[in-house]
Amino acid sequence: LNRQKTLELGATLNPIRPLNIAISAYSGKEPAPLPTSANSGTRTSINATASFNINDAISVGGEVLNVTQDVPVGGGATNSVKYNGVAGYGSFMFTSKIRGALRVENFDDKDGFHFGTPGTKYREVTATGAYLAADSFEARVEARRDQGTNAVFRQYNGALSKSLMTIALQGLYKF
């Protein structure tokens, strides 16, 4: 249970009609990441996304993420751990009811802060097909492949692998 205070700042900008920019920052005390049992340290997350509608059918976007945390190491000293990522995506409306999207992400967890295995870089590719059945309902099928430089993904048999493939069926109701 974390009862510490967190500061959150955010801004959404729409400087021209087809461009949307969102920036957010969070900072506050969080429990130290595993495998340590150290006390809480200050975690700071900065995220920026931008999307641009090229026309009614095509949109592109990008995202940048940077997260750091100070981990107490004793005697009042701290060690800073971090991870960061960058992503790009695009979507295309094939018809008024069918949309496709592709997302590519690179993620660097060099300190093992997020996934627990230091020195690991990740690449993820997601392809999404969507059927817009109504203004309030969307059906999706999504295929995602994750690839790491180290074996960090647990397989069905318990062994670790450098890659992971997932498929999802989704129904989204908008209200």
Question: Could you say what each language-model-derived stretch is?
Answer:
Residues 13-15, 19-175:
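Outer-membrane beta-barrel pore domains
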